[in-house]
């Protein structure tokens, strides 16, 4: 088999493939044998009918279509392997189905051409000798109290209230129904026994303020306006009227902050021990976040002089991954089940789903540009991961997951760990080439933090020690009420921390070994769909739909 490559516009690589006559004949015979085994002809046992009867039963056109389909798919698979291309899209044929069938001869060479989209190569400008400004993150004394208060709030006891109206901080149970400006009910914005904590940020602007002051069993109309950037475009900026019935009022009784409480939420024995541990953790997080600020500053500077043509296929794939990740985050943080997510998505109008995708598109493009820029620098500077350090890290990851009772595919772990290590190496190299001006959260010059080279293993060990100590690491998220009518959390959680302050969100205890690339795409395998039908031909179906001679299909007109 002969394969010729050519560069095409964008990120496309053209392939011209010539299959020799002997291989064509073998493929044709293989197709016929498969048909003979599977076709039942009256008067013959399956697999025993003469070939000419099988061809007559199936139809010569469909036999030829099946043979061409098998031949092309096999040839594409071999061509991709020989050329070591890693496509991000299926193989697209240059010729129409009719043209392929017209020139197919089981006794002669067979040629065809097409293209695949591959990862584009970024054209990186300046990345050595950069000067950047990065924000140093510091720990504020009140952050420890905020963390502890959050855990106390999470374990609060809800006590019924009957002698006063609802006030901020209460948890209420309500029924509500929304109506548009014309008074028409909005069926999708309604709920029964909806539990809501009265915080302004917990619902659309104006709603919580309207509930505050209501008495038990009172029904009230509340006017509220959806934000202009609300993910459902048909509601964005719209003012609606809610008919609200207040059914229950509950107040929170927080547990006392004492040694008993500390022992309940952690393996520490005293409040002092917990505070000491949290101080250390926050300082570690401050260093880590300072380093992330530096990395972001470097990457932003590099992207200013980076050019890359992103194929739409790649952007769509990354956007879909980001949406999936935000839904997974919703599942993990608020206890929403995969079934509930699927139900929610199935009920979304197509235009709403498209709007969600559009919200993630800018981030997807930015992530791809960063990834491809780093990949180009890795190639240019010949940065690599040593086999020994890779295996050591793989063993640590496998052991860490094994302790949690999880068994992972070693090759997937190796790929994920390799990507992490390579990303760490290229960032470490870039930092060594960069001059940094450190500032505080107010933008004033400050002393640089003490950033020491750290391995993923060291970070993971620290976080595992915290996990073993039983210290809660997640922000308190209000439990999602059953029957939530407006699932705003479909969007990824917004990082509300101001730059220069330590976030109190958790750091993942273990690296992800999902299929997503963590930084540098060295080898993207074809999708399972591409593996089984790389060209997406479905020639047999196409032949069945091919118009007879002398007629044109609507597609051809």
UniProtKB/Swiss-Prot annotation:
SUPFAM superfamilies given in the database record: FKBP-like (SSF54534), Triger factor/SurA peptide-binding domain-like (SSF109998), Trigger factor ribosome-binding domain (SSF102735)
Parts of the chain that traverse the membrane: none
Subcellular location: Cytoplasm
Keyword Transferase: no
Record's catalysed reaction(s): [protein]-peptidylproline (omega=180) = [protein]-peptidylproline (omega=0)
Chief location category: cytoplasm
Residue intervals of the PPIase FKBP-type domain: 169-255
Keyword Cell division: yes
Region (Disordered): 438-557
Record EC number: 5.2.1.8
GO function terms (MF aspect): peptidyl-prolyl cis-trans isomerase activity; protein folding chaperone; ribosome binding
Listed Basic and acidic residues bias regions: 455-466
InterPro entries found in the cross-reference section: PPIase_dom_sf, PPIase_FKBP_dom, Trig_fac, Trigger_fac_C, Trigger_fac_C_sf, Trigger_fac_ribosome-bd_bac, Trigger_fac_ribosome-bd_sf, Trigger_fact/SurA_dom_sf
PANTHER family referenced in this protein's UniProt entry, alphabetically: TRIGGER FACTOR CHAPERONE AND PEPTIDYL-PROLYL CIS/TRANS ISOMERASE, TRIGGER FACTOR-LIKE PROTEIN TIG, CHLOROPLASTIC
Entry-linked NCBIfam families: tig (TIGR00115)
UniProt-listed HAMAP family: Trigger_factor_Tig
UniProt record similarity statement: Belongs to the FKBP-type PPIase family. Tig subfamily.
Chain's role: Involved in protein export. Acts as a chaperone by maintaining the newly synthesized protein in an open conformation. Functions as a peptidyl-prolyl cis-trans isomerase.
Domain notes: Consists of 3 domains; the N-terminus binds the ribosome, the middle domain has PPIase activity, while the C-terminus has intrinsic chaperone activity on its own.
UniProt protein name: Trigger factor
Lineage of source species: Bacteria, Bacillati, Cyanobacteriota, Cyanophyceae, Synechococcales
């Amino acid at each position: 088999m002969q394969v010729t490559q050519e560069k095409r516009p964008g990120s496309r690589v053209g392939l011209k493939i010539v299959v020799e006559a002997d291989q064509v004949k073998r493929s044709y015979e293989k197709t016929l044998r498969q048909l003979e085994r599977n076709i039942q002809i009256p008067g013959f046992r399956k697999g025993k009918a003469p070939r000419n009867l099988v061809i007559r039963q199936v139809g010569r056109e469909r036999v030829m279509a099946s043979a061409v389909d098998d031949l092309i798919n096999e040839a594409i698979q071999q061509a991709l392997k020989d050329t070591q291309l890693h496509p991000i899209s299926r193989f697209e044929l240059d010729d129409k189905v009719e043209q392929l069938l017209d020139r197919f001869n089981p006794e002669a060479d067979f040629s065809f051409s097409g293209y695949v989209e591959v990862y584009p190569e970024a054209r990186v400008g300046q990345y050595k000798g950069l000067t950047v400004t990065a924000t140093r993150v510091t720990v504020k004394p009140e952050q420890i109290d905020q963390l502890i208060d959050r855990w106390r709030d999470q374990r609060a006891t809800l006590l019924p209230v009957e002698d006063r109206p609802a006030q901020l901080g209460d948890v209420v149970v309500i029924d509500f129904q929304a109506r548009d400006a014309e008074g028409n009910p909005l069926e999708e914005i309604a709920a029964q026994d909806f539990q809501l904590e009265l915080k302004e940020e917990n619902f659309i602007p104006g709603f919580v303020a309207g509930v505050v002051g209501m008495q038990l069993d009172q029904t009230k109309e509340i006017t509220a306006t959806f934000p202009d950037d609300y993910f459902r475009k048909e509601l964005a900026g719209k003012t609606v009227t809610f008919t609200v019935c207040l059914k229950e009022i509950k107040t929170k009784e927080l547990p006392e902050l004492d040694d008993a409480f500390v022992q309940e939420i952690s393996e520490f024995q005293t409040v002092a021990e917990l505070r000491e541990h949290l101080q250390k953790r926050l300082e570690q997080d401050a260093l880590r976040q300072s380093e992330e600020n530096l990395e972001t500053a470097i990457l932003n500077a590099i992207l200013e002089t980076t050019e890359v043509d992103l194929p739409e296929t790649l952007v769509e794939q990354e956007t879909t991954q980001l949406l999936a990740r935000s839904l997974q985050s919703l599942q993990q943080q608020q206890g929403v089940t995969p079934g509930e997510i699927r139900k929610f998505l199935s009920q979304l109008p197509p235009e709403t789903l498209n709007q969600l995708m559009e919200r993630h598109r800018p981030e997807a493009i930015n992530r791809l540009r960063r990834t491809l820029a780093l990949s180009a620098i890795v190639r240019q500077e010949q940065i690599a991961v040593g086999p020994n350090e890779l295996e050591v890290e793989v063993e640590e990851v496998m052991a860490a997951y094994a302790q949690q009772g999880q068994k992972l595919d070693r090759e997937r772990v190796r790929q994920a760990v390799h990507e992490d290590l390579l990303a760490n190496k290229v960032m470490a190299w870039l930092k060594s080439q960069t001059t940094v001006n450190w500032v505080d959260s107010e933008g004033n010059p400050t002393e640089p933090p003490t950033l020491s080279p750290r391995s993923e293993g060291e970070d993971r060990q620290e976080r595992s020690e915290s996990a073993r100590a039983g210290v809660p690491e997640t922000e308190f998220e209000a439990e999602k009420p059953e029957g939530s009518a407006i699932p705003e959390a479909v969007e990824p959680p917004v990082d509300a921390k101001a730059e220069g302050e330590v976030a109190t969100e958790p750091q993942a205890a273990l690296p992800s070994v999902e299929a997503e690339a963590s930084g540098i795409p060295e080898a993207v395998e074809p999708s399972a769909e591409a593996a089984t039908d790389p060209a997406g031909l479905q020639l047999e179906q196409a032949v069945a739909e091919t118009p007879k001679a002398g007629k044109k299909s609507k597609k051809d007109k």
